[in-house]
From Swiss-Prot:
Mg(2+) 2 binds at residues 225-226. It comes from Rhizobium meliloti (strain 1021) (Ensifer meliloti). This is Anthranilate phosphoribosyltransferase. Pfam families: Glycos_trans_3N (PF02885), Glycos_transf_3 (PF00591). It is an enzyme of class 2 (transferase). 5-phospho-alpha-D-ribose 1-diphosphate binds at residues 81, 84-85, 89, 91-94, 109-117, 121.
Length: 337
């Protein structure tokens, strides 16, 4: 079948799609066979009714089948958020990724330019001098030599060009906000995944379990798709097929609670300058929330036994200059292509 209309009708009637039907529908979308109106109707019908675990698994299957892959070490991790939380914070996961890389854990970071915010990972890294226009071989070399490689989503998921304009015109969250973190081109099995709403914490952990992930935390922190320092973070931790739920507070990281305003960012240039300032030694709320996310990532990757050890390793990555060196090497290797 190469017609999306039957699937639009089914979802509009509030029927759930099987994994097979969901994959077929997204294959149609990603092949370019659906019109913008059909895509918009399908995405919003899913959004209003609520996407199911099976629909997300099927959609991810379609995305992964068409993506441009990257080779990364078995122990690589991704630190990624769905975006779409509307909070306008700094690029928290970007700085956390550099801290983790500086601590010796390879990071295969998947991200994009901002869609619904002022600055995505790609915007900040580009402003810092990282070359985003590189192929899989160079990205693999970045991971090997800098400890961090950035996979620009639009280059690895070229089929997304068929939905990009519709997503921008809709201007609201869709299933694609959920799919990006689940379709890492390096096939990482360890991830810290932030989601834009608390109701997605458990379902995305189930999706990642069904997709074969090994060690994952899916988190939501009081309106943020990150572990937050503003209050309570809900966590679904997947380890070897078992999902455990718990909550975290800033005190669990030895940190003070802060206001959301302290975490507000700006455009790519603004956020890049703030990130560089932390690497240069600034101690502020942006540093602290990134340390917390890095500490959790080091636990997920098995480098730290608990959050206290994770925080110590993360702080050492900054104080020793490890995180700063990771960025410098990433800039150098990416531009040597």
């Amino acid at each position: 079948m190469s017609d999306l209309k039957p699937f639009v009708a089914k979802v509009a009637a509030r029927e759930a799609l099987s994994r097979e039907d969901a994959r077929a529908a997204f294959e149609i979308i990603m092949s370019g066979a659906a019109t913008p109106s059909q895509i918009g109707g399908f995405l919003m019908a899913l959004r209003v009714r609520g996407e199911t675990v099976d629909e997300i698994v099927g959609a991810v299957g379609a995305m992964r089948a068409r993506m441009l892959p990257v080779e990364a070490p078995d122990g690589a991790i991704d630190i990624v958020g769905t975006g779409g939380d509307g909070a306008g914070t700094y690029n928290i996961s970007t700085l956390a990724a550099l801290i983790v890389a500086g601590a010796g854990v390879p990071v295969a970071k998947h991200g994009n330019r901002a869609l619904s915010s002022k600055s995505g990972t790609a915007d900040a890294l580009s402003c810092l001098g990282v070359n985003l226009d590189i192929g899989p071989a160079v990205i693999s070399r970045c991971i090997a030599e800098a400890g961090l490689g950035f996979m620009f989503a639009q280059q690895h998921h070229s089929a997304m060009r068929h939905v990009g304009p519709t997503r921008v015109e809709l201007g609201t969250r869709t299933i694609f906000n959920l799919l990006g973190p689940l379709a890492n081109p390096a096939g990482v099995r360890q991830q810290l995944v932030g989601v834009y709403a608390p109701q997605w914490v458990d379902p995305l952990a189930e999706v990642l379990r069904d997709l074969g992930s090994e060690s994952v935390w899916v988190v939501h922190g009081e309106g943020l798709d990150e572990i937050t320092t503003t209050g309570v973070t809900k966590v679904a931790a997947l380890k070897d097929g078992t999902i455990t739920n718990f909550e975290l507070t800033p005190a669990d990281f030895g940190l003070e609670r802060v206001s959301l305003d302290a975490l507000k960012g700006g455009d790519g240039a603004h956020n890049a300058a703030a990130l560089q300032a932390v690497l240069d030694g600034a101690e502020n709320a942006y540093r602290d929330i990134s340390l917390a996310n890095a500490a959790a990532s080091l636990m997920i990757a098995g480098r730290a036994g608990d959050l206290s050890e994770g925080m110590a390793l993360a702080r050492q990555s900054l104080s020793s200059g490890g995180a700063k060196v990771a960025l410098q090497r990433l800039i150098t290797v990416s531009n040597a292509a």
